[in-house]
Amino acid sequence: MEKNSKIYVAGHRGMVGSAIVRELERQGYNSIITRTHKELDLTRQCEVEQFFAEEKPEYVFLAAAKVGGIVANQTALADFMYENMILEMNVIHSAWQNGCKKLEFLGSSCIYPRMAPQPMKESCLLTSELEKTNEAYALAKISGLKYCEYLNKQYGTDYISVMPTNLYGPNDNYHPTHSHVLPALIRRFHEAKEAGAKEVTCWGDGTPMREFLYVDDLANLCVFLMNNYSGDETVNAGTGKEISIKNLTELVAKVVGYEGEILWDTTKPNGTPRKLLDVSKATLLGWKYKTELEEGIRLSYQDFLSNPMRAER
């Protein structure tokens, strides 16, 4: 990408999209195109086609998505599948129709099989059954990355995909039922501290292992890959480090300053037992994350405190 290239960031108000915009601006890119949902509904094909025909972006970061935690994924299966699939197809297809030089599709590590060998390599995609608790979202994301791959094979496009591990950081979603585990814990422990609660009950038994990547580090990788990688196979984005949900919970409580008891409701689902990405491909390309987990949680908590409205989204 040149510094004056026309770059469209889809989903710029979300955690990932806003981080990509910040990173592009930090690196001196000066022709960044964004649209709010009100200005451009990505699920409406006619609007997307008109936007691409008029704006002709040269590069596209597709970070728009309908996302949520276990509760949302289990109660809105059809919504998650439909909205994600239609917006992905609309953007990717319109980019191809209008001669976009390169597109980067942002997926999720939930695309990998529930019992995939750990750490999960990019090549383990579609080798066995998906995790049922987020199957609808995973299938939609797989469709998006496969469509990019097939366009490359059939039409010679240069469309790449990135599969991040669990993300957190500025502009996260702290909704009580529609957020992911780390922001949900930040909100719960903050509210428990403010209320003087003696105990907090968390789902599951705390044994699942998870990996977390600070979103600004992901954004740095996304720009790096747009400039340095071409290929059909996706690229994993993570730290290569994992932590148990129990230890994560204790770390969040420490950062927030909650000193009460932490209990576990074992009647609730754990989700996937272990999710650690093999990040050797990104490493071999010359990239490495910068933000360690405790520091990232501190920065996230500061962001949460700076804008109380985040908790209401």
What function would you assign to each model-found segment?
Residues A10-M15, A19-Q27, E191-R313:
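C-terminal substrate-binding subdomain of Rossmann-fold SDR/epimerase-dehydratase oxidoreductases
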Residues A10, R35, V60-K66, L103-S109, ...:
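SDR active-site strand-loop-helix element
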